[in-house]
């Protein structure tokens, strides 16, 4: 005598016409399928298929006394459904009975395939899948684990499916995001609670090509950690939010290990930098490789990395600007540099181990004499250590420029400039800085030229304190800044002879000079590197 229900089949033992001994025995087990919809639209489940490589699912069961005979085996079971619908964040269940057999062991490979579609859109059919060995599909606390990963009649086994929208990223744990596609970064940037959470960690899992995407709208503030993981974001176009523009308007977190390639920052009237308009956090081991950044506004600030490295907590370290990067001041009185427009604000903001390559160029057409530098436009009591600039600056209007720093009010240590400044209007040009501050263990081989109305000095055009600083420049004999003429060296060999004294002056800075043995050694006789 057999009885069946939707979820179970069992048998009763009967002697003759009188029930003398009634015994229940489960003959089936039950799969419970749990579906959770995390997508914004309502979905329904139309089918679930359980399959295996071998034919392990019997379609028939014959019972004679204590003997069970399974027949007509198949390698799959199907549960068809018509009304299992879920709105956003809803949970639904489906059930499928099956005959458990000894063939189903912990090493049996199973595949669970659910067919789903968006409610009201039959053309949106898709499948989601879970697969693995029985021992891999269940955790150690599960029923099947307690039965040595064998299915047992009369028990229920749960398999869960999560319907997750393809947002382009994966939340690996609370607050930790792995970006896999361009839309992943875009979608995360649109979540203020993610951007302003100090516990947020965003890691790139792939290079991102943003060239076909709409212009990036800068995130107002970022407080978490963005780890580029050595990946590259290419083709990014950034539009100003208000007066400012950057990947972030204010970075109060950490940006590291990220390259922006062929980045465009459209005309800005305030602060502009590819990574951050204003940096109050850390930007480390980041690269700009090709691109164009333009500002036009009174008191604007422009740098390839950041417009303003602002506070005592601000740090730019081991960053590089290379490739065909063009920085342009189209108008206004602007503080601009290859790396940062302004460093510090009467505070000890820091820049360390960073550089500007020779392919980078600067075009100045501002109104009024802004401060322009190969590395930093205006250093306002910030510190600069172990840096260099090889960029070319061309000024078509009046300008105050330095090969490394324009206006300087802070210490510059173990750094050099070996680029070019061409001034086509009035102004002041210094091979290292336009004026001011303290220079220690620095040198300039900058090529300096200008009209008759331009003051040109080998190191600084204004008052400056310098220790073990030298310049090498054809046609320029005046070091400037009330510095002794002995600060000029005749050639690369003479500068190389200064290594010992320069390294003694910068001892403790974390950097040291070494002789350059490369093909560009005539222009760059000494290289700066970490003193490890």
Predicted features and spans:
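Extended extracellular/luminal ectodomain segments enriched in beta-structured repeat modules
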Residues: 27-30, 41-45, 255
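Short, low-complexity export/processing leader segments characterized by acidic and small residues
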Residues: 10-13, 164
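Predominantly extracellular beta-rich ligand-binding scaffolds that present long acidic/polar faces
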Residues: 138, 166-532
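Tryptophan-paired
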Residues: 1, 44-145
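Conserved "repeat-terminator" motif of extracellular CCP/Sushi domains
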Residues: 21-28, 96-104, 151-165
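A short, Gly/Thr-enriched small/hydrophobic beta-strand-prone motif that recurs across taxa
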Residues: 23-36, 316, 351
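Surface-exposed ligand/attachment interfaces on beta-rich extracellular proteins
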Residues: 14-22
């Amino acid at each position: 005598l057999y009885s069946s229900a939707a979820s179970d089949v069992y048998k009763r033992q009967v002697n003759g016409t009188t029930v003398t001994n009634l015994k229940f025995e489960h003959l089936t087990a039950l799969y419970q399928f749990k579906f959770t919809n995390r997508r914004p639209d309502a979905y329904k489940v139309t089918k679930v298929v359980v399959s295996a490589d071998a034919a392990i699912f019997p379609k028939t069961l014959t019972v004679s006394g204590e003997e069970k005979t399974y027949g007509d085996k198949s390698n799959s079971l199907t549960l068809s459904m018509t009304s299992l619908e879920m709105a956003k964040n809803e949970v639904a269940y489906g059930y499928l009975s099956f005959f458990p057999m000894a063939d189903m062991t912990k090493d049996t490979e199973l595949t669970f395939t659910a067919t789903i579609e968006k409610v009201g859109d039959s053309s949106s059919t898709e499948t989601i899948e879970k697969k693995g060995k029985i021992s891999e599909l269940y955790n150690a606390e599960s029923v099947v684990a307690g039965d040595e990963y064998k299915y047992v009649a009369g028990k229920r086994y749960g398999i869960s499916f999560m319907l997750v929208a393809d947002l382009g990223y994966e939340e690996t744990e609370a607050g930790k995001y792995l970006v896999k596609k361009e839309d992943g970064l875009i979608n995360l940037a649109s979540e203020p609670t993610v951007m302003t959470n100090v516990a947020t960690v965003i890691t790139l899992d792939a290079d991102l090509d943003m060239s076909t995407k709409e212009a990036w709208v800068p995130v107002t503030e970022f407080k978490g950690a963005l780890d580029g993981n050595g990946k590259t974001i290419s083709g990014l176009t950034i539009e100003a939010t208000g007066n400012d523009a950057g990947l972030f308007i204010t970075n109060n977190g950490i940006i590291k290990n990220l390259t922006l390639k062929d980045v465009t920052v459209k005309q800005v009237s305030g602060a502009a930098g590819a990574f951050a308009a204003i940096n109050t956090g850390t930007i480390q081991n980041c690269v700009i490789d090709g691109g164009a950044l333009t500002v036009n506004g009174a008191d604007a600030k422009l740098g390839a990395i950041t417009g303003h490295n602002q506070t005592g907590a601000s740090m730019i370290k081991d960053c590089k600007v290379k490739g065909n990067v063009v920085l342009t001041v189209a108008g206004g009185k602007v503080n601009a540099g290859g790396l940062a427009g302004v460093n510090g604000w009467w505070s000890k903001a820091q820049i360390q181990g960073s550089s500007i390559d020779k392919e980078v160029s600067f075009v100045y057409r501002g109104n009024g004499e802004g401060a322009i530098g190969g590395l930093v436009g205006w250093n306002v009591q910030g510190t600069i250590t172990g840096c260099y600039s090889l960029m070319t600056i061309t000024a078509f209007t009046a300008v105050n420029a330095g090969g490394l720093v324009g206006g300087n009010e802070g210490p510059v240590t173990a750094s050099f400039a070996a680029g070019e400044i061409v001034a086509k209007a009035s102004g002041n040009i210094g091979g290292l800085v336009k004026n001011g501050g303290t220079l220690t263990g620095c040198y300039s081989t900058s090529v300096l030229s200008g009209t008759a109305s331009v003051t040109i000095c080998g190191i600084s055009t204004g008052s400056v304190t310098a220790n073990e600083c030298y310049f090498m420049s054809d046609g320029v004999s005046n070091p400037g800044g009330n510095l002794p003429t002995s600060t000029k060296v005749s050639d690369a060999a003479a500068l190389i002879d200064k290594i010992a004294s320069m390294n003694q002056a910068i001892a403790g800075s974390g950097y040291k000079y070494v002789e350059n043995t490369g093909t560009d050694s005539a222009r760059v006789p000494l290289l700066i590197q970490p003193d490890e």
